[in-house]
Amino acid sequence: MQDLQHVFPRLRSYILYLLALYVLGWGFTSYKAVFAGLILGTALSLYNLWNLVRKFEQFGQALDEGKKPRSIGTVVRFATAALAVVITISYPKTFHIISVVVGLMTYYVVIIIDLVVQNMRRR
């Protein structure tokens, strides 16, 4: 498997392309709340991906140095999801809750699709 540090720029660019599409959808359609929710969720998803890569790097360094590794940031990811829900509940006319949740799951889907595509290219 490729090192996460090498994969992260590719995943980040995919997510940024999705964000650009969502911004276009927000600007040119009447589904503003849905696209605003996707933008919010996907932006926080990108933060979660960046945090995950950073935590995995720290985890690997701790193992290499023989130290006890720290957590990989599960609490931070849960807190990010809670923040998204609080923002969505605070502004229900601006953000659509289901699209925020879908946006939060974006980086998982992007990772899986990238893994499948990269495995197909190697064959």
Swiss-Prot record:
Pfam families: ATP-synt_I
Source domain of life: Bacteria
GO annotation (BP), single: proton transmembrane transport
Entry's Gene Ontology cellular component terms: plasma membrane; proton-transporting ATP synthase complex
Protein name as catalogued: ATP synthase protein I
Membrane topology label: Multi-pass membrane protein
Chain's role: A possible function for this protein is to guide the assembly of the membrane sector of the ATPase enzyme complex.
Intracellular or extracellular location(s): Cell membrane
Similarity field: Belongs to the bacterial AtpI family.
Residue intervals passing through the bilayer: 15-35, 36-53, 72-92, 97-117
UniProt KW keywords: Cell membrane, CF(0), Hydrogen ion transport, Ion transport, Membrane, Transmembrane, Transmembrane helix, Transport
